[in-house]
Amino acid sequence: MNVLNKIALVTGGGTGIGKAASMELAKRGAIVAVNYSRSQSEAEETVEMIQKAGGQAFAIQADVSKNSDVQDMIQAIVNTHGTVDILVNNASITRHIPMDDLEAATEDV
């Protein structure tokens, strides 16, 4: 898949698997939007690593559990770059439940 100059949004893109995806997409020539919710320093570090390697990236904050944050993030990317070509839905929404209440695991979030 040719990703050269494509706009790639990686949710949770500053740490773990998201960071690896961000780095690989940038290595292949994508312009990477590194999303973070609370991990700003890690996202900025990932952007810096990409830029030092000759790639293009920027950090963008949004809590993916909040629809308004997601809409604002997409609008900001579209306003700046015209589109989002690639989406890596890496970030997750977690909810802690008691181990003795497995019924709670089947409820909708």
From Swiss-Prot:
Bilayer-spanning residue ranges: none
Domain of life where this protein originates: Bacteria
Disulfide bonds: none
Protein family per UniProt: Belongs to the short-chain dehydrogenases/reductases (SDR) family.
Protein name in the entry: Short-chain dehydrogenase/reductase homolog YusS
Organism classification: Bacteria, Bacillati, Bacillota, Bacilli, Bacillales
